[in-house]
A protein has these predicted regions:
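Buried, small/hydrophobic-residue-enriched core segments of structured protein domains
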Residues: 18, 24-33, 40-221, 234-238, ...
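Short active-site oxyanion
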Residues: 35, 226-227
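Catalytic cores of alpha/beta
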Residues: 234-248
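Glycine-rich phosphate-binding active-site loops on the catalytic face of alpha/beta enzymes
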Residues: 248-259
């Protein structure tokens, strides 16, 4: 019902010198009177199955055809990829982190929604969360750590801001020599104030080796419930490989190879 042509639209079409005034007048009064039938979001579809059926006069159906195909083709692509990634994760939470690598802001916005449809548990795209009511989640960036004079200072500032949801990115400099050590200092300070940390994130390096080492360190320090999140150009194949290697990873952030 909101498909219509305003006077600015009509003036532009008139300027093309392709349409007579009768047709311009026809478009001025245009209304979509057809019916659209579609499967529910998240439905499993097979090749050759209709996802959307449009029943309308030909001129109305052709006006909406390109827009519908553009939306469906893109979003089913992302939702299918997300489903593959989530299946590879074997029930672990998968977060969508793809906005920075998306093919433009609209692709990031709607791609994040499609990723949720495909099984992701949350997105770092706050606008997607606002517009579509999907869960949002994320961590701080390397630039946050680099802004401060020291990694420890950066971690403390973040923990002070988010004491009840503190998840620290520990690979800005050196995961084992500084990142996890500084994280534990901050975790102990949080615990002394009555808060428990969420965990840490790894975004580079040998994720299998580093996650196993970090898991041991966290457990030995009294944080067996702290989670390890991994990111860094992940896809379903990488996740399967990491799981086969016994990586101690609890959740996955996927972006570049998703959106």
């Amino acid at each position: 019902n909101n498909l219509s042509f305003n006077e600015h639209d009509l003036d532009y079409l008139r300027s093309l010198n392709l349409f007579d005034e009768d047709f311009i007048g026809f478009l001025r009064d245009f209304k979509f009177t057809g019916d659209i039938y579609a499967v529910e979001d998240g439905s499993v579809m097979f090749p050759g199955e209709p996802i959307i059926v449009v029943k309308a006069p030909l001129y109305q159906a052709q006006l909406v055809e390109t827009a519908i195909l553009s939306i469906v083709n893109f979003m089913t692509l992302i939702a299918t990829k997300a489903s593959r990634v989530c299946n590879a994760a074997g029930g672990d939470p998968v977060l969508e982190f793809g906005l920075r690598r998306a093919q433009g802001p609209e692709a990031g916005l709607y791609g994040a929604k499609a990723a949720i449809i495909g099984g992701c548990t949350g997105t770092s795209n706050v606008l997607t969360g606002k517009m579509f009511g999907v869960p949002v989640a994320g961590t701080h960036a390397h630039s946050w750590v680099q802004k401060f004079d020291s990694e420890l200072e950066a971690f403390r500032a973040y923990a002070q801001t988010y004491p009840d949801s503190c998840l620290l990115l520990i690979d800005t400099y050196n995961v084992l020599e500084s990142g996890i050590k500084n994280a534990l200092i901050v975790f102990d300070e949080l615990r002394a104030k009555g808060f428990e940390p969420i965990g840490v994130r790894l975004d580079s390096g040998d994720l299998t080796y580093l996650s196993k080492e970090v898991r041991k360190i966290l457990d030995d320090a009294g944080y067996p419930n702290a989670k390890i999140t991994a990111s860094n150009d992940l896809d379903e194949y990488t996740i399967i490989s990491l799981k086969q290697e016994g990586a101690a990873i609890d959740s996955w952030g996927v972006g570049t190879k998703l959106i």
